[in-house]
Amino acid sequence: MILDDVYTVIQGRRQTPVEGSYVCSLLAKGKDTLLKKIGEEATEVVIAAKGGDRDQTIREITDLWFHCLVLMAEEGISTGDVYQEFETRFNKGRR
């Protein structure tokens, strides 16, 4: 799954920084900057969806998910952890 692939690249950048990498520069700026960026991206999703621009909404959701993956890597949360939470919630709702 592509989310796993992107997450793996992000983890690699954390472990072995690459000069000029956006992920590395974001991580170097600290958690507060990353959290601010996630807030900005979430707002951009809302604005795009409110405007009815499907393609822009997709792009903004992709940006939001990407930055959430960076946060997950920083916090030691794997994609598997999130998939498990989705599965738990989905299965709970099906009972």
Model-identified regions with their sequence ranges:
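Flexible "arm" and connector segments at domain edges
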Residues: M1-I61, W65-R95
